[in-house]
A protein has these predicted regions:
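Positively charged, low-complexity terminal tracts
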Residues: 1-285
């Protein structure tokens, strides 16, 4: 049975003064309350999903004006009046059986149905209208801010607007050493563009492309937003960061890999255009 949410509360749980779990207490439409827990990886999936649904709500607001605005306000007021209170033990002694292992959305025009798998192997089905998404984002954000865990907050903020699909060592083009980062197809479908990205570094004999990546993002290619994103990735992606710490990063390059937004590209469909882009670009350096 699919449940509808009439109220939500969030509380961040810390361990050794660092963020550990996000407690989420949900009130159903029949006023029954349940508390679940999200680790960082699942919480990131939830935030990315809610950001996408909130963006769709903004689009509908632009199309439908005051009527849709009133609908959003009414929904947020209802949620605000039905915030369930935590019991002290729910935050101090989390029930591991209610740890969320994964979330998988099924998309509809104005809502998504969230299939939630728990540690105890129970499966929940939650309907989340798009007009609730912004409220849920704010609830999670407020709980995170209360932790004062600046390191985790910076980490979260730096990885919400892209997905790293592949990191590639391009120092030896005769053998592409790569690392694949797997993401569920639903998550990939939330990002519009596949980009091949190259990083060139200063060497004694001149400039050379030493690393690359294939990412998905909603940042329009060749914009300041995309350029800043690519530079940020160089500072946070482990393989890239190691090179940046040893060598001076001179230039970054990007190129769209043509594909439908919902298409999940194969290894060859990612590596081949990245390799060809690298050969073309290296000639210009």
């Amino acid at each position: 049975m699919t449940k509808k949410i009439s109220g939500i509360n969030t509380g961040a749980i810390k361990f050794n003064d660092k963020f550990c779990l996000m407690a989420v207490k949900i009130k159903d439409e029949d006023s029954t309350c349940h508390t679940y827990y999200m680790q960082l990886s699942v919480m990131l999936d939830f935030i990315i999903l809610m950001r996408d649904r909130a963006h769709k709500a903004v689009k509908k607001l632009q199309e439908n004006g005051e009527i849709y605005k009133a609908k959003i306000i009414a929904e947020h007021e209802k949620l605000a009046m039905n915030i369930p209170a935590f019991e002290e033990e729910e935050l101090q002694q989390p029930n591991q059986a209610n740890l969320i292992i994964s979330i998988t959305p099924k998309f509809a025009d104005e809502h998504c149905t969230l299939i939630v798998v728990l540690q105890n192997e129970h499966i929940l089905s939650l309907t989340i209208p798009d007009i609730q998404a912004e409220f849920f984002i704010l609830a999670v954000q407020q709980a995170l801010n209360a932790t004062n865990d600046t390191e985790t907050l910076k980490q979260i903020a730096s990885i919400l607007d892209f997905l790293m699909l592949y990191f590639v060592d391009l120092s030896d083009l005769s053998y592409l050493n790569y690392k694949e980062i797997n993401h569920e197809p639903w998550k990939q479908s939330l990002f519009a563009q596949h980009l091949a990205v190259l990083y060139s570094f200063e060497k004694e004999e001149g400039e050379e492309i030493l690393a690359g990546a294939v990412i998905k993002t909603n940042a329009p290619p060749d914009t300041e937003e995309a350029k800043n994103l690519i530079k940020r990735i160089a500072l946070i992606a482990p393989g890239l960061r190691e090179i940046v710490e040893k060598r001076h990063l001179t230039q970054t390059f990007m190129k769209v890999i043509p594909a439908d937004q919902t298409q999940v590209l194969t290894l060859d469909e990612c590596m081949r255009p990245l390799y060809e882009f690298c050969l073309e670009t290296q000639k210009t350096l």
